[in-house]
């Protein structure tokens, strides 16, 4: 597949005018400002934090949820002294935190807002969290026991999670998508199912068991009352105009990828974006052949760009892409990156663009010229978030006779998002903390990394409202 190399584009597109300078014509640059991030901070140093997800509530607070660690436990005997991180908050439920100061401090969320304990009275499931919000500001999360799929909700901006359907479905790797007020869709990966609730997640009706979307669905910005967008496993988008009843799929030209789940984003104008990150093939991989590729989908022509754009990366390997979009053309991609010669050290990288579907600039001679998406790339974590191997075999990692080769503490993915001001942030697992005896911990801990410089995902901040009262208090 032909790749569009971003650095090479500068030369090859001089006639098209990307920041071009010649004796006669000058064209403005479309490249965003350099991107910088804070040092990683731990959301919690004493609780598990693999596969973290996030949502920004309508009051501006940030909610993070993570895997409880049951199927992520590191089997190295030296990790046993760190078992407290797994045991202290194990209630056969996922773990949840909330920040009201932009991620500076975090509060663990238990029953009725308590700082300890289980989060819901009836929901059960130690793994596979996912967060979403409906148009009314109600939050939803999901968790599984490798059999039941439980959906639980928060009517108070993530301060508590009092409502739940403990058996909304059955299967592995669910995702939730909030739509109209009290409407939430539940996607289950295996066996494939799509469910819909119109009563705030209390009951669900089956929509389909045969559709092309693979992984987390999005509400279609161009059809917010009925439309859904879903990623294709091989790269691309599936579009439904009727609440998931019918779909049309559009495969995307993309490079190799090491990922369990397809990932797409849609900006507020309706443009769709996809990214792949690949090269890392597992615990025995020492070849630095990684790549990160990006593409964009035009809703009017119903076509992807003919060639994917290769985002600049250091020589090494890449895996587990995630993508988010804000205002028109503003897109960010995150992935884990290794550096050549240091194959066992993994960093969290982020790339972003403010002209994600290309842009037209006016040059000094008055001509208009097209500029393809331009990216800035940052080593967001600045330090390794994991040293060692990463197992790519899902729950079967536990059967690996080598504890290092079966290391699954990070889970299967991590995510990027932005706050109500448009600042990017990454939530990831981190395995660098030591137990009391100096050995590794049996689970990862959750970290938060926030943008400190660069353009924002929003031209103007989203409006926020007053925080709702802790459920079920009528006033506060």
Feature-to-residue mapping (PLM):
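Secretory targeting and sorting signals
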Residues: 1-20
């Amino acid at each position: 597949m032909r790749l569009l190399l971003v650095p090479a584009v500068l030369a090859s597109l001089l006639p098209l005018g990307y920041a071009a300078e010649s004796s006669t014509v000058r064209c403005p640059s479309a490249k965003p400002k350099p991107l910088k991030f804070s040092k990683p901070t731990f959301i919690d140093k004493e609780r598990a934090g693999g596969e973290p997800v996030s949502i920004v509530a309508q009051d501006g607070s940030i909610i993070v949820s993570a895997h409880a660690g049951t199927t992520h436990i590191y089997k190295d005997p030296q990790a046993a002294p760190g078992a407290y991180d797994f045991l202290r908050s194990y209630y056969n439920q996922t773990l949840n935190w909330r920040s009201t100061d932009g991620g500076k401090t975090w509060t663990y969320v238990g029953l009725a807002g308590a700082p300890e304990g289980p989060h819901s009275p009836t929901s059960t499931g130690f793994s596979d969290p996912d967060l979403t919000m409906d148009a009314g500001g109600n939050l939803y999360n999901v968790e599984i026991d490798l059999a039941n799929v439980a959906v639980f909700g928060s009517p108070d901006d993530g301060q508590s999670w009092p409502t739940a359907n403990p058996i909304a479905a059955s299967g592995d790797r669910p995702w939730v998508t909030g739509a109209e007020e009290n409407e939430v869709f539940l996607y289950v990966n295996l066996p494939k199912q799509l469910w819909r609730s119109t009563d705030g997640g209390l009951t669900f009706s089956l929509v389909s068991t045969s559709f092309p979307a693979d992984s987390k669905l999005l509400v279609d910005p161009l059809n917010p009352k009925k439309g859904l967008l879903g990623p294709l496993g091989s790269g691309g988008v599936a579009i439904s105009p009727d609440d998931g009843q019918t779909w049309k799929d559009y495969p995307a030209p993309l490079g190799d990828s090491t990922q369990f789940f397809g990932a797409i984003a849609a900006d507020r104008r309706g443009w769709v974006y996809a990214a792949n990150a690949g090269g890392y093939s597992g615990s025995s991989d020492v070849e630095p052949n990684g790549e990160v590729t990006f593409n964009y989908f035009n809703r009017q022509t119903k076509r992807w760009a003919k060639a994917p754009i290769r985002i600049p990366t250091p020589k090494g390997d890449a895996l587990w892409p995630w993508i988010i979009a804000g205002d028109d053309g503003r897109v960010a991609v995150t992935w884990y990156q290794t550096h050549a010669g240091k194959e066992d050290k993994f960093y969290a990288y982020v790339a972003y663009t403010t002209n994600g579907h290309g842009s037209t600039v006016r040059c000094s001679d008055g001509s208009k010229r097209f500029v393809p998406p331009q990216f800035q790339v940052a080593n967001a974590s600045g330090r390794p978030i994991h040293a060692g191997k990463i197992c790519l075999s899902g729950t079967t990692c536990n059967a690996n006779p080598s504890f290092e080769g079966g290391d699954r503490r990070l889970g299967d993915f991590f995510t990027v998002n932005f706050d109500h001001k448009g600042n990017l942030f990454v939530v990831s697992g981190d395995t660098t903390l030591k137990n009391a005896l100096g050995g590794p911990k049996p689970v990862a801990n959750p970290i938060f990394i926030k943008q400190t410089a660069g353009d924002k995902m929003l031209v103007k901040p989203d409006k926020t409202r007053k925080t709702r009262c802790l459920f079920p208090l009528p006033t506060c």
